[in-house]
């Protein structure tokens, strides 16, 4: 496909927005889903200060801004800011005119219907796209792994969900959703670092903690044993240099933080961990297809890239499943972007071209057409 008519694929995550052209093997633009507004009054005239900043620019000026994420738990909570992010995506990052390209958007399963209707409306009415489609994130991850059957455990910044898919069909009755993901882990790390005597409170400092989390955290294979090791020696301690040059030391926090994925009670949540959620999702499926799901458990999303997470999932699910069951956890190296990659594959298939919602269909039926045309 040519860039001039290629479809645009935009994976709007709660934490990062991934965007690019269908047929490419990686997104061209990856930037934080942040809109920042100045905290202070501008006093220098003629500096061209803006009333809002998006993405990396907001991130780099975070010291003077209040940062807001318009997508929380996979659901858009602020449409004005969301429009700014889309505008930034098309005009500044991809440098395309959205009225010339079909646009594929993604969303979390079990999202409110109004959410996808509003997405559809903005695409056609604000950006005048010729055609668009909304795809379920986990389904795209499975496409990207080259499978048509499997269960996807997709965990990003805002939401985690397990989606069993059989022969290309998602099984909606067995989809489970857990509102515990990367952002909750960042907040939890802020909390446990405070207990160590380091104070992180502002929206800008949260971004520093997110960086600590991404660079130093890992999942322990055996949590209790790891805690004992950490208590008896300093072998697990690592140091991190803050932007102001101060160096902090972090020990058992490195694995206590992501442990909350397996023990949500750490965050005061009553829900099951990601291993049990995956198991429960499989158990909601027909008994005949469970074997195929156990053998094709695919991890996807940025919160699944902690070192050690695949081995731990293997261990936990093996303990829950029947003893003779073959269990395989697939953790593709590109899983941070597998939703986007799956979207790129889908939007460039010749068989997909009749699936788009066209501007004409939208004008005839209104936003509710999205429920009829997009699973």
Curated annotation (Swiss-Prot):
Q: What is its EC number?
A: 3.6.4.-
Q: Which residues carry this modification: N6-methyllysine?
A: 84
Enzyme class, top EC level, equals hydrolase
Which Pfam families does this UniProt record tie to the protein?
Actin
Instruction: Output a single Gene Ontology CC term carried by this record.
Output: dense body
Name any one GO molecular function. hydrolase activity
The yes or no answer to whether the keyword Heme is present is no
- Bridged cysteine pairs (disulfide): none
- Answer whether the UniProt record assigns the keyword NAD to this protein: no
What does UniProt say on post-translational modification here?
ISGylated.
Reactions catalysed according to its record: ATP + H2O = ADP + phosphate + H(+)
Any idea where this protein resides?
Cytoplasm, Cytoskeleton; Nucleus
Describe the family membership recorded for this protein in Swiss-Prot or TrEMBL: Belongs to the actin family.
Q: Quaternary structure? A: Polymerization of globular actin (G-actin) leads to a structural filament (F-actin) in the form of a two-stranded helix. Each actin can bind to 4 others. Identified in a IGF2BP1-dependent mRNP granule complex containing untranslated mRNAs. Component of the BAF complex, which includes at least actin (ACTB), ARID1A, ARID1B/BAF250, SMARCA2, SMARCA4/BRG1, ACTL6A/BAF53, ACTL6B/BAF53B, SMARCE1/BAF57 SMARCC1/BAF155, SMARCC2/BAF170, SMARCB1/SNF5/INI1, and one or more of SMARCD1/BAF60A, SMARCD2/BAF60B, or SMARCD3/BAF60C. In muscle cells, the BAF complex also contains DPF3.
Protein role: Actin is a highly conserved protein that polymerizes to produce filaments that form cross-linked networks in the cytoplasm of cells. Actin exists in both monomeric (G-actin) and polymeric (F-actin) forms, both forms playing key functions, such as cell motility and contraction. In addition to their role in the cytoplasmic cytoskeleton, G- and F-actin also localize in the nucleus, and regulate gene transcription and motility and repair of damaged DNA.
Miscellaneous remark of the record? In vertebrates 3 main groups of actin isoforms, alpha, beta and gamma have been identified. The alpha actins are found in muscle tissues and are a major constituent of the contractile apparatus. The beta and gamma actins coexist in most cell types as components of the cytoskeleton and as mediators of internal cell motility.
Q: What is this protein called?
A: Actin, cytoplasmic 1
Please tell me the species this chain comes from.
Sigmodon hispidus
């Amino acid at each position: 496909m040519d860039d001039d008519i290629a479809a645009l694929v935009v994976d709007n995550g709660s934490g990062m927005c991934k965007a690019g052209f269908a047929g490419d093997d990686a997104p061209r633009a990856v930037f934080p889903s942040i809109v920042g507004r100045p905290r202070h009054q501008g006093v220098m005239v003629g500096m061209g200060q803006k009333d809002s900043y998006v993405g990396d620019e907001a991130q780099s000026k975070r010291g003077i801004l209040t940062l807001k994420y318009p997508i929380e738990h996979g659901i858009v909570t602020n449409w004005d800011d969301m429009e700014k992010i889309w505008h930034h995506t098309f005009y500044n990052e991809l440098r395309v005119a959205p009225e010339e390209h079909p646009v594929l958007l993604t969303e979390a399963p079990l999202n409110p219907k109004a959410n996808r209707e509003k997405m559809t409306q903005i695409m056609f009415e604000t950006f005048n796209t010729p055609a668009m489609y909304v795809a379920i994130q986990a389904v795209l991850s499975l496409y990207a792994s080259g499978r048509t059957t499997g269960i996807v455990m997709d965990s990003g910044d805002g939401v985690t969900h397990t989606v069993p898919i059989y022969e290309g069909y998602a099984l909606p009755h067995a989809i489970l959703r857990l509102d515990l993901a990367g952002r909750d882990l960042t907040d939890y790390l802020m909390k446990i670092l405070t207990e160590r005597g380091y104070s992180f409170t502002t929206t800008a400092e949260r971004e520093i903690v997110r960086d600590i989390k991404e660079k130093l955290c890992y999942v322990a294979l055996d949590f209790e044993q790891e805690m004992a090791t950490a208590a008896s020696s300093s072998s697990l301690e690592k140091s991190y240099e803050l932007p102001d040059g101060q160096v902090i030391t972090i020990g058992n926090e490195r694995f206590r933080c992501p442990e909350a994925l397996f023990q949500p009670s750490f965050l005061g949540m009553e829900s099951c961990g990601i291993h049990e959620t995956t198991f429960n999702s499989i158990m909601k499926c027909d008994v005949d297809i469970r074997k195929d799901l156990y053998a094709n458990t695919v991890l996807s999303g940025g919160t699944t890239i902690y070192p050690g997470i695949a081995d731990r999932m293997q261990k936990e699910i093996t303990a829950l499943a029947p003893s003779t069951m073959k269990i395989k956890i697939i953790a593709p190296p590109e899983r941070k972007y597998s939703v986007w990659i799956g979207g790129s594959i889908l939007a460039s298939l010749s068989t997909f071209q009749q699936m788009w919602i066209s501007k004409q269909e939208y004008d005839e039926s209104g936003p509710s057409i999205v429920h009829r045309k997009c699973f």
